[in-house]
Amino acid sequence: MTRPVTGKDLMIVNMGPHHPSMHGVLRLIVTLDGEDVVDCEPILGYLHRGMEKIAENRAIIQYLPYVTRWDYLATMFTEAITVNGPEQLGNIQVPKRASYIRVIMLELSRIASHLLWLGPFMADIGAQTPFFYIFREREFVYDLFEAATGMRMMHNFFRIGGIAADLPYGWIDKCLDFCDYFLTEVVEYQKLITRNPIFLERVEGVGIIGGEEAINWGLSGPMLRASGIPWDLRKVDRYESYDEFEWEIQWQKQGDSLARYLVRLSEMTESIKIIQQALEGLPGGPYENLESRGFDRKRNPEWNDFEYRFISKKPSPTFELSKQELYVRVEAPKGELGIFLIGDQSGFPWRWKIRPPGFINLQILPELVKRMKLADIMTILGSIDIIMGEVDR
């Protein structure tokens, strides 16, 4: 007996929140017509921890360890955005040496983030071999972090007015050696991955985003630059000391998953160029603005006294945030990371609104996967590069 055909039989499939390709606790409710994707609904919030509300009950120096749990693979950027806001509100000048060290750490963190994106992205589309090579280089970056900050991840290194401690002896030479080594490894990645016909078959023409569409969706970072828009906040806002270095914005016109891969691969090379220039031109002087540590402005402490010799061990003071509104942003590996800060003449922020790049970039996923194949969901989601810690906050 044959069953009468009354219409298309659509299948609803849950992907996640424990799927290995979900890059965290993301859940997708996918409607399928055979292998074709009809609809896709992302379900968020599994990693929500109330980060914005916590900020309203903490001083900035108390809140710094929390912010490293947003994007826990690029923690230097969350620390930078957290100290940049109060620095601008209080008009605190950062010493040149501290600014250069910040740039070095930010670019090393960008490389580590892109490497940790590239390895699982290749594994998602079936290429297991590059994963191990990529994680080898990532370990070298984490060794540099551990030598400078004491932590491989969650560094808690940035401070209002500077950084927690100066670079240790021999660290600069070790970092320069890594830069020379890593440039040769990027060439190996290009030979192993970029020219691979199977890889090109999986990513070329998949998940295409036009330039105008990317702007309308509010995309940023490699998602925007891969769609033909050369927009980089390091050039636009010129924060820290980025305008003192020579480097180029990396962008592509195609707007597909391959273009996003190429942008991130090229960005790692540009980051190495910035790091090399910063290390070679690293100025002397203090690594923090000591006056920003003054609790009582009327008292002029003797910074050369014995009790101030180990100043990096001392806790920073609680700053009074003036009654102003301020939006601060940095170019994180995943896009524009920003905070909207409202002060209220107290040590705690009245409002701390986070603008996570991953959350906004993820919004276009249902639009990209419609009319694609089920296997393309992994390729497109991987090319977006999300971390659920910052998406859910």
UniProtKB/Swiss-Prot annotation:
<dbReference type="Pfam" id="PF00346">
    <property type="entry name" value="Complex1_49kDa"/>
</dbReference>
<comment type="function">
    <text>NDH shuttles electrons from NAD(P)H:plastoquinone, via FMN and iron-sulfur (Fe-S) centers, to quinones in the photosynthetic chain and possibly in a chloroplast respiratory chain. The immediate electron acceptor for the enzyme in this species is believed to be plastoquinone. Couples the redox reaction to proton translocation, and thus conserves the redox energy in a proton gradient.</text>
</comment>
<dbReference type="GO" id="GO:0016655">
    <property type="term" value="F:oxidoreductase activity, acting on NAD(P)H, quinone or similar compound as acceptor"/>
</dbReference>
<keyword id="KW-1278">Translocase</keyword>
<dbReference type="InterPro" id="IPR001135">
    <property type="entry name" value="NADH_Q_OxRdtase_suD"/>
</dbReference>
<keyword id="KW-0874">Quinone</keyword>
<comment type="similarity">
    <text>Belongs to the complex I 49 kDa subunit family.</text>
</comment>
<comment type="subunit">
    <text>NDH is composed of at least 16 different subunits, 5 of which are encoded in the nucleus.</text>
</comment>
<dbReference type="InterPro" id="IPR029014">
    <property type="entry name" value="NiFe-Hase_large"/>
</dbReference>
<keyword id="KW-0520">NAD</keyword>
<dbReference type="InterPro" id="IPR022885">
    <property type="entry name" value="NDH1_su_D/H"/>
</dbReference>
<keyword id="KW-0472">Membrane</keyword>
<keyword id="KW-0793">Thylakoid</keyword>
<keyword id="KW-0521">NADP</keyword>
<keyword id="KW-0934">Plastid</keyword>
<keyword id="KW-0150">Chloroplast</keyword>
<dbReference type="GO" id="GO:0051287">
    <property type="term" value="F:NAD binding"/>
</dbReference>
<dbReference type="GO" id="GO:0019684">
    <property type="term" value="P:photosynthesis, light reaction"/>
</dbReference>
<keyword id="KW-0618">Plastoquinone</keyword>
<dbReference type="GO" id="GO:0048038">
    <property type="term" value="F:quinone binding"/>
</dbReference>
<protein>
    <recommendedName>
        <fullName>NAD(P)H-quinone oxidoreductase subunit H, chloroplastic</fullName>
        <ecNumber>7.1.1.-</ecNumber>
    </recommendedName>
</protein>
<keyword id="KW-0813">Transport</keyword>
<dbReference type="InterPro" id="IPR014029">
    <property type="entry name" value="NADH_UbQ_OxRdtase_49kDa_CS"/>
</dbReference>
<dbReference type="GO" id="GO:0009535">
    <property type="term" value="C:chloroplast thylakoid membrane"/>
</dbReference>
